[in-house]
Amino acid sequence: MFVGKALQFQSFHSSIDATFWHQLSNYKVEKQKLDASPLTIHGKFNTYSRGNISIVFGEAPSNSNIKDCLAEGTLLNANTPQEFTNADVKKIREEIGEVLLNSIKNGVVSERPNELLRFLIFSYADIKAYKYHYWCLFPSFKETPHWIVKDLSPAESLIPSGPILSQIREFLSTADYYQRPFFLLIKSTLDEWTIAPLKELSHCVDKSLQFYLVAEDSVQLAEYPSWPVRNILAFAFIKFKLKVINLFLYRDGINSDTLSKSILIKVEADKDMILEAPLSIVGWERNGKGVLGPRVVNLSTVLDPFVLSESASTLNLSLMRWRLVPQLDLDRIQNSKCLLLGAGTLGCGVARNLLSWGVRHVTFVDYSTVSYSNPVRQSLFTFEDCKRKLPKAECAAQRLKEIYPNMFSTGYNISIPMLGHPIYEAGIEKTMHDYETLENLISTHDAIFLLTDTRESRWLPTVISTAMDKLLINSALGFDSWLVMRHGSVLQKENRLGCYFCNDIFAPSNSLVDRTLDQTCTVTRSGCANIATAIAVELFVSLLQHPNGHAAPVLNEDQTVLGELPHQIRGFLHNFSLMKISGMAYPQCSACSECIINEWNREKWMFVLRAINEPDYVEELCGLREVQALGEIAGTMEEWISDKESVIL
């Protein structure tokens, strides 16, 4: 600044950290979606920030630090890169210029001086690539006259710093945040200086009082005032027709005991200011190359990989709610704790599908180790796992965490007690421990997936899950067929859906006795497991969208935002067909009937031990023995009638 020369101003430099872009990304994905409405942001600076303004997402806080000046801003975020590239930036400038001019003319600035700091950011967020394109506009009028410096002096040379500093501190401590950037220093008739809000300017002009326009001035170079000073001069010129203005550039800060950095300037306009539509607005920030144009920030190289993994893994799910399924309850899915009984072909497939739906808590139960035949069919295992003979459950859990580090996954290497597999004295303690672990796991999880190799291994989990009224999804494979079904809920009462065993008139027994190799291994067409596991998880997710969860009835109509909720889905690859079947719970079912559940509730482990070691106990308890007897009588009668008819003929 030199006397006789035109006053020049230092542009603001935006300072935007990764937090801002992370908040924008979350807001865009979760709330704003396709809406392109302007968003509220704010900036803050002080006398120590050296011309930098920190941009913050959201509204300006009313209880901000008294050292800071707050600028209110608008964020326009384009939905596509084409919208950003082809935008009419001239129109954007004119619109914000109109807002600024109207605020000056209608008196808003007098009441809220920080309106002179209003700014805009035009952006495009490439959320998938973590790249953010943006252009900041700190608007001012191009038609502003040249302000010629008539006088220049240190503040301390004309104003007593002691009394003034205490008044400034008191004003900044008590004034609302929107009054802090600009205020008045008025000289009274008694030659005393007092601090007053900007709205007193009209009184000063009417009474011809001596005053200074005070601006909190954040600069990098002491020779030039900051960009907001340009707007306070324009305000005084437009609103009050002032052509000669005394400026007090306050640069010392509220903690300073002196005014050694502050400057007093007297300026005069060299011409009238003509404002005609369309307004010419300046103030676009220059990019890193020093030219007018957008900046680009790439956060993929600086963000924590765990943060990147978290946001990227849920992005596709969140995008479903933009257009396709706005009511999709992702939180209910992601917060579900899932227990997978079986870590084989079905278990691996279900786990990967749960992971893709955002489930973050998966527990495996399996008693076998990874064999050389597994990796080609079971997606969570590798050749190295076979060589080391790792337990399947623990290995699968570890592999999930390698795929997604924020996953909470554990594996339990336990055996499920099974009907038809007697427990001998030496194995009672181990089997009881496994049983207690299984019971505890079922009680602490929200959803159970039955994915074991044999029918008898599904019996005990069915009993416990029914007694605890857990959501249970059952999936089983044949050679070219598969089954996915949900078990009913006790809340369905007389309309309770059946379980896996409700169509059987015999309790499950040892299915591995007297079987050849092709009957003891899972021999199935390769695609069956992939289809079955996908549908099992989709049924689980759909159930969570119904207010009644797994107690939802079966209706031939869309029951949730994701569609129908069948009871059973059976698929056949030989003719590529699907069947949806419904069946009610069987009163004499060996797994879910009332008498079985009541007995388990009473005896717990002792019931299980007796059921396993006494072959006929379960059938007698649930009434299947009587059903079988009636069937034998009916069969005998049918044979007798058939013999009689043949005699007559």
UniProtKB/Swiss-Prot annotation:
GO molecular function term, any single one: Atg12 activating enzyme activity
The keyword Plastid appears for this protein: no
CDD domains: Apg7 (cd01486)
Subcellular location field: Cytoplasm; Nucleus; Preautophagosomal structure membrane
Catalytic residue list: C521
One GO-annotated biological process of the protein: cellular response to nitrogen starvation
Record bears the keyword Aminoacyl-tRNA synthetase: no
Disruption phenotype: Impairs atg8-processing. Sensitive to nitrogen starvation.
Mode of membrane association: Peripheral membrane protein
GO cellular component term of the entry, any: phagophore assembly site membrane
Motif (GXGXXG motif): 342-347
SUPFAM superfamilies: Activating enzymes of the ubiquitin-like proteins (SSF69572)
InterPro entries membership: Atg7, Atg7_N, Atg7_N_1, Atg7_N_2, ThiF/MoeB/HesA, ThiF_NAD_FAD-bd, Ubiquitin-activating_enz
One Pfam entry name: ATG7_N
Main localization, broad class: cytoplasm
Keyword annotations: Autophagy, Cytoplasm, Membrane, Nucleus, Protein transport, Transport, Ubl conjugation pathway
Domain of life: Eukaryota
Oligomer status and interactors: Homodimer.
Domain remarks: The GxGxxG motif is important for the function, possibly through binding with ATP.
Cited NCBIfam families: E1_like_apg7
Similarity comment: Belongs to the ATG7 family.
Function: E1-like activating enzyme involved in the 2 ubiquitin-like systems required for cytoplasm to vacuole transport (Cvt) and autophagy. Activates atg12 for its conjugation with atg5 and atg8 for its conjugation with phosphatidylethanolamine. Both systems are needed for the atg8 association to Cvt vesicles and autophagosomes membranes. Autophagy is essential for maintenance of amino acid levels and protein synthesis under nitrogen starvation.
Name of the protein in its database record: Ubiquitin-like modifier-activating enzyme atg7
Organism (species): Schizosaccharomyces pombe (strain 972 / ATCC 24843) (Fission yeast)
Gene: atg7
